[in-house]
A protein has these predicted regions:
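Hydrophobic, well-ordered beta-alpha structural blocks that scaffold small-molecule cofactor pockets
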Residues: 2-138
Length: 138
């Protein structure tokens, strides 16, 4: 196998792992009792959700009955899916309105990059990764 073929195979293996983890997280979000228990365990009463894609919108729908979801945060200030009635703000807006609430990061592929931006103005203890929130793992 050539180096180029190995790189392509590695790329597809990584993409497959990300897709499988996303699929597992979507399944975990269907376990509403678990989600409610995880909210209690993490003492979450107010929350921002980072990521306007499927995982962010699904998390919003599941936690909304239990906590005050301030908004979904997306760098662009828009949802990636067409859903009405969900408050969405940009990262720049979050910088001006944030008041020590928890934030759960839903984009799996870009978690580290997003966290790096958030720790500039948010205490690291208030930032959770979706996998960490749902399963206690990063």
């Amino acid at each position: 196998m050539s180096n180029e073929e190995e790189l392509i195979l590695d790329y597809y293996a990584q993409a497959y792992r990300l897709e499988m983890f996303s699929y597992r997280m979507m399944g975990k979000l269907l376990e509403t009792d678990n989600v409610h228990n995880r909210l209690k365990k993490n003492n979450i009463t107010e929350l921002y959700i980072y990521g306007g894609g499927y995982l962010g919108v699904q998390l919003y729908n599941v936690v909304k009955p239990y906590v005050d979801v301030k908004a979904i945060v997306d760098k662009s200030g828009n949802l990636s899916v067409n859903v009405k009635g969900i408050p969405v703000i940009s990262l720049d807006k979050l910088r001006t309105v944030y008041k020590n609430e928890k934030i759960i990061i839903t984009p799996i592929k870009y978690y580290k990059m997003i966290k790096k931006e958030l720790v500039e103005f948010i205490n690291e203890d208030n930032i959770l990764y979706l996998g960490e929130f749902l399963e206690g793992v990063i």
